[in-house]
């Protein structure tokens, strides 16, 4: 009798996980995901209602970082995390996932520490001075995000 060893191979498919509460590029994410046949998981707190007919939607209790931790808990190496939150981006990178912000900036081990440092310094400055908020979002910001996300997917798929 001959013995055969069957090799079991797990194939992992990239997914897009979105810290979606204040995400201004949900439409762009869905456009690319549908084109690339990727799953999308949108994470919201319970102050939001959302349905797009494509994404898996998670509605979580409104609380300290509940959305952030739920997103990171299901993330895996190779996923793309869309977030404005440097802490979430840091945790994503530690899991060997990719992280990108709403303007198309791809977070990496080289830039995340300087971003965290700058955030801390800016928080100190804001406490002592009246500073304006971020500039108004433009259509070009959405185009930049779309192009960066598409490039990130194509380079790592």
Locations of the language-model features?
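Nuclease catalytic cores that cleave nucleic-acid phosphodiester bonds
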Residues: 15-157
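Short, positively charged and aromatic/hydrophobic N-terminal segments
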Residues: 9-10
